[in-house]
Amino acid sequence: MAFLKKSLFLVLFLGLVNLSICEEEKREEENKEEEDENEALSEVKRGFLEKLKTGAKDFASAFVNSIKGT
């Protein structure tokens, strides 16, 4: 009977360890996915800001040229 108890505890312990490892891997994978999404969003923002900056420069130079022409 004691042998069965020890075996059962061993099986339960190994199951809990395995479950813990799986949960940790799952969390790491989710964190990596979030980082990838944040990186992609950052690239989109960077591209938008570059276009906005270029547009502002073009607008300013056109505005200055229109003032000089009058």
UniProtKB/Swiss-Prot annotation:
Position of the signal peptide: 1-22
Propeptide residues, chain positions: 23-46
Modified residues annotated as Lysine amide in this record: K68
Membrane-spanning intervals of the chain: none
Name used for this protein in its record: Frenatin 4.1
Keywords assigned by UniProt, alphabetized: Amidation, Amphibian defense peptide, Antibiotic, Antimicrobial, Cleavage on pair of basic residues, Immunity, Innate immunity, Membrane, Secreted, Signal, Target cell membrane, Target membrane
Natural source organism: Nyctimystes infrafrenatus
Protein family: Belongs to the frog skin active peptide (FSAP) family. Frenatin subfamily.
UniProt keyword Signal present: yes
Tissues with expression: Expressed by the skin glands.
GO biological process, one term: innate immune response
Gene Ontology cellular-component terms listed: extracellular region; membrane; other organism cell membrane
